[in-house]
Amino acid sequence: MRPLDRKIYLASKSPRRRELLRQIGVEFELLMLRNDTVRGPDVTEDAYEGESPADYVARVANEKAEFAWNMVHQRRMKIRPVLAADTTVTIDGEILGKPGSQAEAIAMLEKLSGRTHQVLTSVAVHFTDLSEQFTQVSDVRFAKLSAASIKAYCATSEPYDKAGG
């Protein structure tokens, strides 16, 4: 009997997700979905009109997992579970994605400063004919940030790879 392959595919660019899996001892192979020539219009990170933040983050995580699962089959890769996740920040009903510019990052952080917002993370796992998904919502209270500290932070590379900066 062959030993069970305990490795998974991680369909995420997030350095934080990779670090979390390493911390708990999960072996993974990274699947890059962005800039992939087979990636079609099946995964959009744009929120649909009227889509709630919870529905949005769950849909994106599920679409990433489904796309990655299909990619594994198309490329005839070893069959392993595929894990995908998405995180978004919401305040006043507005979904805040990753800032695309320094001005956008500053505006997001000014909006969050001194207020409570929600961070939603949805995780989706696809394997053979099984699919599992869950979403976690956390309330986060930001301290009041000075304009100088926001500007200094936004001058680094830190805010540009995460929702809400």
Where are these regions (language model features)?
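Anionic-ligand binding patches
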Residues: R2-R6, R22, A47-G165
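A short small-residue
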Residues: D36-Y48
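N-terminal beta1-alpha1 ligand-phosphate binding loop
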Residues: R2-E27
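A short beta-strand-loop structural module common to alpha/beta enzyme folds
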Residues: E27-R39
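Cofactor-binding loop segments of dinucleotide-utilizing enzymes, especially the Rossmann-like FAD-
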Residues: K13, L33, T128
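Surface-exposed, flexible loop/turn segments at secondary-structure boundaries
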Residues: R16, D36-V38, S131
